[in-house]
A protein has these predicted regions:
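Active-site phosphate/ATP/adenylate-binding loop shared across adenylate-forming ligases
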Residues: 47-176, 182, 186, 191-197, ...
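Nucleotide 5′-phosphate-binding alpha/beta core
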Residues: 1-96, 100-102, 331-333, 337-394
């Protein structure tokens, strides 16, 4: 039976690990309220400060995978992942049978600028005994490429949902079919229409696994059942809390290069407990950022570009949708009567040049448009406030 998660329920099982990892022995004697009142929340700014302090590690005997994230949503964050010794997340992936020796995986993660997910997933999968094939640019895949994938019995797809769908579309255009029995997605939620495409293509028995992750922590939870909106927390690695409707995580082992102590993920979720299993459902980003093709884009990033054309404060609403060809669309609503038709075109062009949006357009995965709309028609909350972001993608 599911019960509402309360931090006090699991505190006694994690406090000694936290005390040891962070060299704070007093924590072993604390109650959970003492912990939450005594240890401050670690925000992005605090993480970045520790990030700067980690540079000396690059001259140590260990090797690291170096990635940079969130370039369009604020300060470029450097993320380090251990490449020597125990490989990150391997024990959990083996325990949950995410990867195994019979897997031949097509890695669909786009090899983007300074992007680490491609190498990270390959590293974890290979450490579990799986075979890895890096796919690269979908736009140049030919029939012989699919024949080569069939020859080596490719049976697993790994990637962001939109990349998985794009790969399927190219495969179908070439009139080829891989015998895929497992699909592993990360980077964003799997939408209902995407799940339907995967099932219709590879059959109802295909196993779909979601990885809930962030660049600072790596993989935090897996969705293993039919409901890919319900995630099982990796309780051997993380202690989770709720703070002002946000999720906080604390590392329980030293696999994170920068251990996290009450780190604010910025996401919200419902948390429940079933035996020793902690489940996360209805995971949502905060309402001033959105996930577009696996990238987190801040509302303020869009606003800053609009203000170049009109410095005064105006209401801007962002609508997210899916086109008939399954490409994702960002539609930026601006008030009528402020911009000339020429300015609208220039604004649309500059917004499209935001790196992650531009890349999605170049890869034919998504695009952006600007529409003039009377603010009276803007979508509002039940309290009558104009919403920053309206997500109609599912």
């Amino acid at each position: 039976m599911l019960s509402i998660y309360k931090e006090e329920m699991v505190w006694n099982t994690v406090k000694d690990k936290i005390a040891t990892l962070f060299q704070l022995p007093a924590i072993s004697q604390w109650t959970y309220p003492q912990f939450s009142q005594s240890i401050p929340v670690m925000e992005k700014k605090g993480y970045l400060a520790k990030n700067d302090q980690s540079l000396h590690l690059l001259n140590s005997k260990n090797s690291y995978l170096i990635g940079f994230t969130s370039g369009t949503s604020g300060t470029l964050k450097r993320c380090l992942y251990k490449m020597s010794g125990d490989v990150y997340n391997v024990k959990e992936c083996e325990e949950y049978n995410i990867f195994c020796s019979t897997d031949t995986c097509a890695n669909l993660f786009t090899i983007n600028l300074l992007f680490s997910a491609h190498c990270l997933f390959s590293n974890v999968a290979s450490a579990c005994g799986a075979n890895i094939i890096s796919i690269g640019d979908f736009n140049v895949l030919a029939s012989e490429h699919f024949d080569a994938l069939i020859d080596v019995n490719t049976n697993v797809l790994i990637g962001i949902p939109c990349e998985i769908i794009q790969f399927i579309q190219v495969m179908q255009k070439k009139e080829k079919l891989l015998a895929i029995n497992k699909v592993i997605f990360a980077g964003e939620a799997l939408k209902a229409y995407q799940r339907e495409i995967i099932k219709n293509t590879f059959g109802n028995d295909v196993h779909i696994i979601g990885a809930y992750a962030c660049s600072e922590a790596g993989i935090i939870a897996f969705s293993l059942g039919e409901d890919n909106n319900s995630y099982e927390l990796l309780t051997n690695q993380f202690f989770i809390e709720r703070y002002q409707d946000r999720l906080l995580i604390t590392s329980l082992d030293n696999m994170n290069v920068i251990p996290l102590l009450r780190y604010n993920l910025g996401d919200s979720a419902d948390i429940s407990l079933k035996g020793n299993i902690i489940r996360l459902t209805n995971i949502k980003r905060n309402n001033i950022s959105f996930n577009f093709m696996g990238y987190i884009i801040e509302y303020e990033t869009i606003v800053a570009v609009v203000h170049k054309f009109h410095p005064a404060d105006i209401s801007i609403q962002i609508h997210l949708s899916v086109a008939k060809d399954t490409r994702e669309v960002i539609t930026v609503w601006v008030p009528t009567g402020i911009f000339s038709p020429q300015q609208i075109k220039l604004l649309e062009k500059e917004l499209t040049e935001i790196p992650d949006i531009y890349e999605s357009k170049q890869l034919n995965q998504g695009y952006l448009v600007v529409n003039e709309v009377d603010p009276i028609q803007y979508i509002r909350s039940v309290r009558g406030k104009i919403l920053y972001i309206v997500d109609n993608r599912d």
